[in-house]
């Protein structure tokens, strides 16, 4: 043991640890979990933290806070790794490498519709629907781009089932040749199924299998003199070959993931390149939060690299065995490579190898991954140095003693008092936190009363924040002195102190750069120069709050107008309105519908159908 003063209880606990696989949780004096780890031998691993040889900065900082340790014995290392991964996701301990919850990364989802499956972007923390999932992808843009590619080549529908059922004629997707209009039976379930199977193979990287199948189907179509179908298949082959050329095919059997990692002070970057059947299928960047900001010792840098790699293995591979490849290639040796190989192979049901710094063809993959890694790191550093400098400028402007860790901004949106919505956006030292944004539907106020709307939104928000103990350091209000004064009164009534309240008023010209800032705590108003970094940060937050508010307002206004339009027709209540919208997909389509189609809607009599039709065609 080192010179750390251990309690008698903890010292005794260390001597009685079992020599079995399992996980351990290190807790501070308040019972907060500081770190979660796994071990093939709990006794050896946990005691190693208190060894004199363990001199790492991060380890010393961690050990100094440990007041108790909890363990869970598992039947195998595989079970330990799974449990460790799940606990890290659930508890998000301070000293673990933290990857963003994989449920917040976007996936491609192919539904399990019996005849005509739908392709869509899926990202939710709710229980996922049944069907096939592909991903995760690094961002929404990558998913949307892939879906568009699949629609262009394989023409898979992307409309909601309710819209699909209600169609009586093809939609715009058919007109622009991204769908085969299965809604009106322009394609048989059998042929659509072939397209879906090809799309799945495409997402799995099996392009050559698709090309061979398409070539055979094109040959059959020509022999049957079905030249129209042959032309469609020819275009699919052409587009697929173009994608293959862009991806750079390498003649090598098997699948591989190439993982390059760089650990820097304050963050790490993981570049994962997916190779399937010799071609680059995907390249993604992940930026986990590292547990310690200062890496001034080689030991800490190496141990964090190892921890980052293991965290990524748990995050990326253990939830779904379909993602585990034949080979994982890395740019640095792995301390527990054999153990990880065994765990992944056991989970997969067949061999998975880990290879370090490969030669030959595989080295080109690593070069590709490392090159992308450098670009990703450079972009991250550039972006976050700008964010940090802006935060520092705002801190100096507001003369704050502590760093700004969290800011929130409120805005109100309505159209002459109609469909009033308040938005709340959240920023931290990483920038915007969209998952924490909130919208508030404002009810029970005089239409157009922005003061009452702001009062209601801030009251509702801060009652929740007080309970969660998650108050911002700076609260920004998009509005003038009157709105800011209302918010100040709300905070005082709730007993909220130590928050810097700042108003951002657009000024008489309402032009960017002429904003007037209202600092309530000091009872002063001022205008910043256009090149002020603090002003740029405030403009960014204010604009994001405005965007979020106006988007919510437009959706609410549209919904309200649809409801009021239909319910103004005698005989149309909530149930019939819903039936009409489900059948036609929207008010615009209903307005275009002929009388015969309206009569087909369940619950709509011929007389009522005439009344509805005459409402839109007086």
Swiss-Prot record:
Keywords: Cytoplasm, DNA damage, DNA excision, DNA repair, Excision nuclease, SOS response. It comes from the Bacteria. Residues 208-243 form the UVR domain. Pfam families: GIY-YIG, HHH_5, UVR, UvrC_RNaseH, UvrC_RNaseH_dom. GO terms for cellular component: cytoplasm; excinuclease repair complex. One of its GO terms (molecular function) is excinuclease ABC activity. Residues 19-97 form the GIY-YIG domain. It is found in: Cytoplasm. GO terms for biological process: nucleotide-excision repair; SOS response. InterPro entries: GIY-YIG_endonuc, GIY-YIG_endonuc_sf, GIY-YIG_UvrC_Cho, Hlx-hairpin-Hlx_DNA-bd_motif, RuvA_2-like, UVR_dom, UVR_dom_sf, UvrABC_protein_C. Belongs to the UvrC family. HAMAP family: UvrC. The UvrABC repair system catalyzes the recognition and processing of DNA lesions. UvrC both incises the 5' and 3' sides of the lesion. The N-terminal half is responsible for the 3' incision and the C-terminal half is responsible for the 5' incision. This is UvrABC system protein C. It comes from Legionella pneumophila (strain Paris).
């Amino acid at each position: 043991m080192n010179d750390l003063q251990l309690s008698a209880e903890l010292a005794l606990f260390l001597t009685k640890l079992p020599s079995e696989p399992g996980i351990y949780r290190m807790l501070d004096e308040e019972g907060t979990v500081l770190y979660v780890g796994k071990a093939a031998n709990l006794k050896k691993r946990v005691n190693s933290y208190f060894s004199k040889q363990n001199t790492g900065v991060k380890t010393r900082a961690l050990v100094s806070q440990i007041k108790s340790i909890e363990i869970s014995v598992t039947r195998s290392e595989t079970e330990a790794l799974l449990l460790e991964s799940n606990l890290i996701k659930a508890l998000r301990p301070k000293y673990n490498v933290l990857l963003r919850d994989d449920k917040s990364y976007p996936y491609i989802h192919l539904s399990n519709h019996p005849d005509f499956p739908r392709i869509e972007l899926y990202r939710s923390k709710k229980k996922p629907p049944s069907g096939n999932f592909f991903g995760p992808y690094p961002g929404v843009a990558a998913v949307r781009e892939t879906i568009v590619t699949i629609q262009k080549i394989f023409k898979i529908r992307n409309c909601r089932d309710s819209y699909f059922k209600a169609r009586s004629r093809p939609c715009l997707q058919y007109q622009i040749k991204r769908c085969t209009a299965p809604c009106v039976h322009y394609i048989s379930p059998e042929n659509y199924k072939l397209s879906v199977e090809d799309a799945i193979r495409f997402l799995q990287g099996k392009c050559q299998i698709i090309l061979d199948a398409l070539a055979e189907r094109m040959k059959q179509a020509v022999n049957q003199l079905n030249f129209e179908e042959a032309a469609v298949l020819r275009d699919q082959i052409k587009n697929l070959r173009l994608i293959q050329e862009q991806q750079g095919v390498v003649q090598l059997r098997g699948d591989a993931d190439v993982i390059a990692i760089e650990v820097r002070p304050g963050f790490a970057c993981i570049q994962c390149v997916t190779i399937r059947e010799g071609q680059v299928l995907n390249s993604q960047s992940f930026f986990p939060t590292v547990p310690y900001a200062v890496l001034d010792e080689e030991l800490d840098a190496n141990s964090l690299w190892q921890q980052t790699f293991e965290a990524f293995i748990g995050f990326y591979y253990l939830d779904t065995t379909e993602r585990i490849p034949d080979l994982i290639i890395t740019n640095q040796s792995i301390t527990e490579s054999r153990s990880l190989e065994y765990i992944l192979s056991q989970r997969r049901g067949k061999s998975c190898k880990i290879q370090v710094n490969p030669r030959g063809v595989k080295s080109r993959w690593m070069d590709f991954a490392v090159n992308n890694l450098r670009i990703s790191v450079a972009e991250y550093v550039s972006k976050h140095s700008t964010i940090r400098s802006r935060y520092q400028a705002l801190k100096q402007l507001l003369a704050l003693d502590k760093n700004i860790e969290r800011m929130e901004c409120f805005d109100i949106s309505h159209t002459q008092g109609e469909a009033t919505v308040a938005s709340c956006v959240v920023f931290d030292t990483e920038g915007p936190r969209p998952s924490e944004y909130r919208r508030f539907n404002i009810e029970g106020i005089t239409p157009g009363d922005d003061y009452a709307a702001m009062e209601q939104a801030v009251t509702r928000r801060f009652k929740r924040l007080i309970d969660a103990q998650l108050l911002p350091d700076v609260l920004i209000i998009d509005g003038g002195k009157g709105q800011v004064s209302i918010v100040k009164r709300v905070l005082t009534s709730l007993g909220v102190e130590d928050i810097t309240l700042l108003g951002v008023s657009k000024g008489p010209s309402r032009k960017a750069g002429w904003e007037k800032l209202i600092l309530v705590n000091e009872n002063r108003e001022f205008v910043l120069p256009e090149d002020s970094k603090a002003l740029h940060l405030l403009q960014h937050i204010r604009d994001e709050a405005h965007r979020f508010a106006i988007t919510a307002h437009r959706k609410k206004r549209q919904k309200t107008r649809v409801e009021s339009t239909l319910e103004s027709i005698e005989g149309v209540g909530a149930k019939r309105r819903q039936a009409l919208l489900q059948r036609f997909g929207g008010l615009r389509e209903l307005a275009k519908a002929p009388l015969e189609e309206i009569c087909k809607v369940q619950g709509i009599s011929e007389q009522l159908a005439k009344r509805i039709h005459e409402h839109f065609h007086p």
